[in-house]
Amino acid sequence: DITDTASIQKLIHNCDAIIHTAAIAATGKKSIPLIKATNALGTKLILELSVQAKLDPIIYVSSQSVLHPPPDGKYTNSCPISPNLLGAYAESKAEGEQLARNFQEQGKPIVIVWPSGIIGPDDVGVSVAANGIARLLKSPILPLPKTGGILMHDVRDLSKVLCKSLSSGLGPRRFGVFGHYLNWAETENFLNEVTGRKIRTVRLPNAVFHALGRFGDALSHLHVNFPLDLATARFMTTLVPGDDKSTRESLSLEWRPLSDSFKDTLLWLTRKGMLSKESIPAIFNSPK
């Protein structure tokens, strides 16, 4: 329980370092109370107790949403926390990151890592991104906005970043893991190629796309599950590329191709029973 001091103290006893990834990562209005009650407080306790215990390094996995929208139209390792955050999740992560940055200014060995959208196989649950991929490939028609796009990377690349960040004695550091950006036209072509079938899409004005998000928020109050909320809709229409070259150079890494990540994710989703083999003929009907 990351909101319980005794639980955390027991966890970090005799530890040299810590990686803090735990958070409520969900969308929709019904998730807001749990997000607010868990993320910021949990991060505060973990960072403060880890600093007191003199752990090195103390790795805080933040979120690229904390930097959105970036001031210069691109996410970088030098971006400030955004003053115009979209949604309760971003707000909760920003509150934790502000504390992490304060500790960095004091010279504490805090490492801040910003993942973008995370995909890949073998999730211990089924993430928001994986659910979204399964849902869109089962949809008869996919509504897309006019602007924005997707920004994604592979969970296995993120794990390498976290492992390589575990060296002690290096002080405060910041690593963006922004990955691959595709605008919506590129995303449509990419999905057609990686699945081997024509994805039917309809391009909507951003105002209409945002209205769908508001509709989703309204339905959530009635406990009706809808695949879009306003914060997500706004995020999707304003997403921009990131520059993580300094991260890759510092840690001697290169990100795996997005097509490989998607194919592995789709194979895993079929094993989970969330997608049919017929929905991705490029993988299951290709020559052996």
Features from the language model and the residues they span:
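Conserved Rossmann-fold NAD(P)-dependent oxidoreductase catalytic core, especially the SDR/UDP-sugar
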Residues: 41-89, 111
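Conserved beta-loop-beta element that borders a ligand/cofactor-binding pocket
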Residues: 98-122
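Conserved cofactor-binding/catalytic machinery of classical short-chain dehydrogenase/reductase
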Residues: 4, 41-45, 57, 95-96, ...
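NAD(P)H-binding glycine-rich loop region in Rossmannoid oxidoreductase-like domains
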Residues: 2-41, 49
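Mid/C-terminal beta-alpha module of Rossmann-like enzyme folds, strongest
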Residues: 161-228, 244, 256-288
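A conserved pocket-lining segment of Rossmann-fold NAD(P)-dependent short-chain dehydrogenase/reductase
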Residues: 132-153, 157, 161-165, 169
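Glycine-rich "substrate-gating" loop/helix at the edge of Rossmann-like oxidoreductase active sites
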Residues: 86, 116-126, 144-156
